[in-house]
């Protein structure tokens, strides 16, 4: 009996199954079990939205504007859910992560620049985590910040050592750290009791009133979208088994979307709690003059006083544990992102501890120098500089992601719909425009108001403004460059595999037909 391309021989009796995918469907687990098996990548990724850099911008937004900027967090995390789902879908459909696709798509000089920028983004994201961990050790054990920074250089290696027992166990530990941090801030919020009506108004009614509201909202939005996260999410999803059938890939994409939604909802609640606590305490009518001075320039190391009136001496411990969980868990994701960036662009695979040591060694140098010379205030300013670098980096990860996920050459029949494409590009360029505005205004403001001699500022301007022009040209190039390289998707690979299986089945069936009857 002949067997067609879409047929396969199954069982001892030679029963023919008309659709290869139907055989896989017979063995499927319940949907909820398959969903649970895909939990992990979203929680790893959501840590970037809970890192010490985000905590600092949240604290300042609450202190300066109470609850008025909560809507920025809501919009930012909705956009984050969209682009993170695009990143996950890209990995699921193509079987490759973003760094690998960039390496294959772009010319040598372009992909070299993208690799260097991606590495810089990983290092810049590690600086707030190192400093935040140093502040946490300072609060918990009363050691100098620079000593805490040194300890932070090696502490994450202990957590990464869990990977030898399996990635899933490391993901469980990371998820526990997320919930520890969330629990700390929810406890804080329940104690200070911000007015619910004002919190809801701030969350759903956009307002930009008061001095500095625009700048603080830009800082909030810029701190939410991390470029290294886009490389990370597209790679983490590859650790799960993905069926090559169209239905199987859609199911997996849906699972990752739901999981990312849950993880980012937790991140939203934590960010709301941080802003609400800061806004409630710093805008209280009975605030002491000493605390009012702290609220005027709120930083990570000075924020434990927010709970002093209700928790006493234990406020520093609760806040320190939350800050430590934030710094340590965020560092793990940065290490993974750096490894995938290096492997994707250069085909170099490094051990986790070695990759962490390399990234941390580079990030710890400026953190250590600044914390020794400038103390806590200098370390806080370094966090702001690192956030500016990440804002600068964003287009060089976001634009390739938007182009690849909308390309029929990369995604085939699974490419984004015209509505998702339009919505993603509009939101993407809004974020990019905001980041460029934030970066340029900060640079121009610094040039106009620093204490350097006039001729030094002129030289800085001569160097910086051509670089800014080059930056804009690079963004335009990435946006309008035609997508040229076509990839064979999982679905096309499966189709070829089905053809081969059908040919083998045909040969087997022919051999059976030639055998004399018993």
Swiss-Prot record:
Keywords recorded for this protein, A-Z: Ion transport, Iron, Iron transport, Membrane, Transmembrane, Transmembrane helix, Transport
Gene Ontology CC entries for this record: plasma membrane
Transmembrane annotation, as ranges: 35-55, 68-88, 107-127, 131-151, 172-192, 218-238, 255-275, 315-337, 357-377, 382-402, 418-438, 458-478
NCBIfam families associated with the record: nramp, Nramp_1, PRK00701.1
Single GO BP term: iron ion transmembrane transport
Protein's membrane topology: Multi-pass membrane protein
Family membership noted in the UniProt record: Belongs to the NRAMP (TC 2.A.55) family.
Source organism of this protein record: Oryza sativa subsp. japonica (Rice)
Name of the featured protein: Metal transporter Nramp1
Principal location listed in the UniProt entry: membrane
One of the record's GO molecular function terms: manganese ion transmembrane transporter activity
Free-text function comment from the UniProt entry: Probable metal transporter that may participate in the control of iron homeostasis.
HAMAP family noted in UniProt: NRAMP
Cell compartments where the protein resides: Membrane
Domain of life: Eukaryota
A Pfam family of this chain: Nramp
Signal peptide: none
